[in-house]
Regions:
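A ligand-binding cleft/hinge motif common to bilobed small-molecule-binding domains
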Residues: 52-57, 227-243
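Extracytoplasmic/periplasmic solute-binding protein
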Residues: 90-94, 99, 123-173, 180, ...
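Extracytoplasmic "Venus flytrap"/periplasmic binding protein-like
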Residues: 10-77, 106-117, 214-218, 223-224
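Hinge/lid segment of periplasmic solute-binding proteins
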Residues: 49-99, 114, 123, 180, ...
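Extracytoplasmic/periplasmic substrate-recognition and gating elements
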Residues: 20, 110-111, 238-288
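Extracytoplasmic "Venus flytrap"
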Residues: 1-3, 23-24
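A local structural motif
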Residues: 11-25, 43, 112-114, 189-207, ...
Length: 288
């Protein structure tokens, strides 16, 4: 983000000030709650929003239409559709990232383990790794644990029969999100109960700072981490390990399943510096 902001500042001849979210700042509020509050009060010009927040703010008329920007012309249709609310393109992702498992393949080979495809195979891998002395086989933080739950919950929905009909039923309240989510949370609870994930540590850890993450994983003392892969971190974070690393989707009933995220850049409809913010989005979300 620092590089893209610097590029926009240089190209447009302006200065950008941005606020990052940490648990320390808003211990009683989620990131989405903070974004909703600030956008509804026109506190900022530009926002980085999660998908459900984009839909909420877009439907309330708080976000500007970005369809006229140059960077919007080459969007894939699935991306455009996901960020269109009431006929307006109200957000553009800076990048699309895939969440999954980063695996130290050298450790797996030493333990004679194959990469897991199903939840049952994953549990067996964790059992063996723990027996081999890896106290917490899976590194995690408070942000990304949910992605494993989503993989379990929606693997069938998005890879099964009539996706549109199932989504419509959810939106209409004819089926319950809890029915989809429960198996995922139950599986996560199993991982925590068996000691494969340090939940207490993850609860208070920021990204890459949890037990088993960051330096632990890169040093080869933790076999698996939950993380994301995208253009922005191919050469950072876990991009250059000294061991053979495999990136796989989360094990599910349908095999390895990545979870895609399209966090979007949006501009406040009534932002104080609306025109300048639109130009910034055009730069930071460009193909360059």
């Amino acid at each position: 983000s620092d590089l893209t902001i610097a590029m926009a500042e240089e190209r447009l001849g302006l200065t950008l000030a941005y606020h990052t979210y940490t648990a320390e700042n808003y211990q009683d509020k989620t990131y989405d709650e903070v974004c909703l509050e600030r956008a509804r009060n026109n506190s900022d010009d530009l926002y980085l929003l999660n998908t459900d927040t984009i839909v909420t703010l877009g439907s309330e008329g708080h976000l500007a239409d970005l369809s006229g920007l140059s960077c919007a012309q080459n969007l894939r249709e699935v991306v455009r559709t996901a960020n269109t609310v009431d006929g307006k393109l109200v957000a553009i992702p800076q990048e699309v990232v895939a969440y999954g498992l980063f695996v130290n393949k050298d450790i797996f080979d030493e333990c004679e383990l194959s990469l897991p495809n199903t939840p049952e195979e994953f549990l067996e891998c964790c059992r063996v790794l723990k027996e081999k002395g890896y106290e917490t086989p899976v590194g995690a933080n408070r942000w990304w644990l949910e992605t494993f739950v989503f993989a379990q919950a929606y693997a069938d929905l998005y890879n099964g029969g009539d996706v549109a009909a199932e989504v419509q039923a959810l939106n209409a309240g004819e089926t319950r999100y809890s029915d989809y989510m429960r198996p995922g949370f139950e599986f996560l609870k199993t991982l925590i109960g068996l000691g494969y994930v340090d939940a207490e540590n993850a609860l208070v850890s920021e990204a890459f700072e949890g037990a088993g993450e960051g330096e632990d994983f890169m040093a080869g003392t933790c076999p698996i981490v939950m993380a994301y892969w995208g253009a922005a971190n191919t050469d950072t974070a876990y991009g250059s390990p000294s061991f053979d690393m495999e990136v796989i989707g989360f094990p599910s009933a349908r095999g390895q399943m990545p979870v895609l995220s399209m966090t979007g850049c949006a501009v406040g409809e009534r932002a104080e510096h609306r025109d300048e913010a639109l130009k910034v989005v055009d730069v930071i979300c460009s193909d360059e």
